[in-house]
Structure formats: structure tokens, C-alpha cells
Amino acid sequence: MKQVNGEKLLASLGDGVKDIRGRITPDAPMDRVTWFRAGGLAELMFQPHDVDDLIAFLKILPEEVPLTVIGVGSNILVRDGGIPGVVLRLSAKGFGFVELAGENRILAGAICPDKHVAAMAMDNGIGGFHFYYGIPGAIGGAARMNAGANGVETRERLVEVNAVDRKGNKHVLSNAEMGYSYRHSAASADLIFTSVLFEGYPEDRAQIRAEMDAVRNHRETVQPVREKTGGSTFKNPPGHSAWKLIDEAGCRGLVIGGAQMSSLHCNFMINMGQATGYDLEYLGEQVRREVFEKDGIKLEWEIKRLGVFMPGREVRPFQGVTSE
């Protein structure tokens, strides 16, 4: 796919951008905003000031221009050819809030870190959110993918999601309308989540603190929390743990280029220093191949791969045919 110059794309939006209050950056380096610290350029990055600013921008953005929404960059792998069109990165100022919204209820902006919701709940004696303390990333992504840990999932706490569609129309989706399943929601990919309403239950703050401490201590013991990583690489197949399948296939510590499957937790892929998007994705596909050849199970990516490949540096997805 041919990538248009960012300045040219910006100019094509016309005078309407003069009323936009957020930050617009042509040719924005994605390796500065993703936790993997790898990948090419975003043709145009937009960080809206608030919901109204987001709507104003969407109304001037032509439908044919691709739009990619990212959160804090914790669960994405950007390919080296970059991301054509507009990358929407919600700003912490307009979308990073967290506040009480009634008895045992919390309202959080889509870019609010998961752990901030856990902390707000603990401070106010609201139970049921300790699991967020161990999940990297932001609330919008957690709501989108039904993030979970320690036996609890987002769908168990979520009341509704506020969103905006590609045309700038507002929507409110109930828990039922989200259509949740394991690490998945049925919400339209066209919807941009702006905030999420949660509900917990009364619980002693000391008990919540103990639960959060247990989550933190476990995570720091078994996960490479200080490495350049995007979190869990693959979903757990039904009845199996992805890390165990990876380990049994001999892929713990496997290295390709500057990328490695962590020796500490082998379902975490890490950038050892200078890994490219190609290195990381090739490593992931090689792991999928090795696991399939060992156990006949096709691992499904949990990390989202975004953008286009550099010419001559394409990664073929493993299709589950060992003769490939």
C-alpha cells in the first residue's frame, strides 16, 4: 500500500483544521508511543483535546482516509512500513480522568490507566477492581477486548460504554450490547470509546489493598514488567495456557533479530534493544508454527498488529499447515 506524505494528507483536510484544538502531527514516529518501541510512522497522528474536539475532527475527515485508534500503546505492534491515514491517540488531558459516579460506581476516560481505576476503587472502598492493578494499558482497550486477570474480567464490572462513531455521532452501549466473550467484544470497530462506567460493591479498604498488593507482587515476580513489551502475546486457547504451550514447544527465550520470547514469562515478547516490527512479528509467527507442530494448536494473537510491511520485509502469517 502506497503511503501518502503526512503533510499532504494534512493539507487535504482544508481550512477545517483551523478550528481543531488538539495536536495534529504529520509523519509521527510510532516507536515513541508504543510499549514495544518499534515500528514505522503514522501518516498523521491526531490527539483530540476532548470529546467535542474529536467529533469536530471526525466531521472533516474524509471517509476514504483510514482511521486507526490506539490507546497508550501497550497492546499493539506497529509494522515497519507505518500506518497509512490517521492514527487517533486520545489525550490524557481530555480522556485520562477517573471519578466517582454514584454509589459504588466509577466513570473513567478511555485513556485512563487500568491501575488508576483500581486505585480509585480502593481509596473509596469499592471492591471488584483489584485485577486491574496488574493489567498494563488503558480502560478503553480493556473495555474493547474484555481484559481480565486473576479470574476476573472487565465485563463483570462494566455498566456501559460511551463512544463516538466515524461520522461523529455519540453512542451509549450497555454491557449486553457489548457482546462480550473471552478477550473479545462484539462492539463495532467503527466506534471510538471515550469513557466507561463501572460498578463494584462495598469492600473493606484494607482487604482491597491486600488483594492489590498480591496482584502486584505476583506480576513483578512472573512478568517482565521492566522490559519493552506489549503484554500477553497470545490468547489462551480453550483448556490451555498459552505460556505452557510455548514453553513445551521449546520457545522460551527464543530470539529472532532484536526480539525475544521472555525467559521469565514466555507468552511475553520483548524488544531487547533494537528490534524492528519485522523481528517481533516474525518471532510471533515462528512461535505459532512451533506450537502447532508440537501440539496441533493454533495460537491466536492477543496483540494487535497494525500498519503495513516494508517492501521485501513481509511476514507471512502461519496458517496451520506444517509443510509451509
UniProtKB/Swiss-Prot annotation:
Q: Could you tell me which pathway this protein works in?
A: Cell wall biogenesis; peptidoglycan biosynthesis
Keyword terms, alphabetized: Cell cycle, Cell division, Cell shape, Cell wall biogenesis/degradation, Cytoplasm, FAD, Flavoprotein, NADP, Oxidoreductase, Peptidoglycan synthesis
User: Which Pfam families is this protein grouped with?
Assistant: FAD_binding_4, MurB_C
- Protein's UniProt keywords contain ATP-binding: no
Which InterPro entries does this UniProt record tie to the protein? FAD-bd_PCMH, FAD-bd_PCMH-like_sf, FAD-bd_PCMH_sub1, FAD-bd_PCMH_sub2, MurB, MurB_C, MurB_C_sf, Oxid_FAD_bind_N
| UniProt subcellular location | Cytoplasm
Top-level taxonomic group: Bacteria
What GO cellular component entries does it have?
cytosol
Q: Which GO terms describe its molecular function?
A: FAD binding; UDP-N-acetylmuramate dehydrogenase activity
Q: Where is the active site?
A: 183, 232, 302
Ranges for domain FAD-binding PCMH-type come to 36-203
EC number of the protein: 1.3.1.98
* Cofactor(s) for this UniProt protein: FAD
* Enzyme class, UniProt record, top EC level: oxidoreductase
**Biological process (GO), any one:** cell wall organization
Give the catalytic activity. UDP-N-acetyl-alpha-D-muramate + NADP(+) = UDP-N-acetyl-3-O-(1-carboxyvinyl)-alpha-D-glucosamine + NADPH + H(+)
Which family is this sequence assigned to? Belongs to the MurB family.
Tell me, in a sentence or two, what this protein's role is. Answer: Cell wall formation.
Record-linked HAMAP family: MurB
Protein name, per record: UDP-N-acetylenolpyruvoylglucosamine reductase
Name its species: Rhizobium etli (strain CIAT 652)
Gene symbol? murB
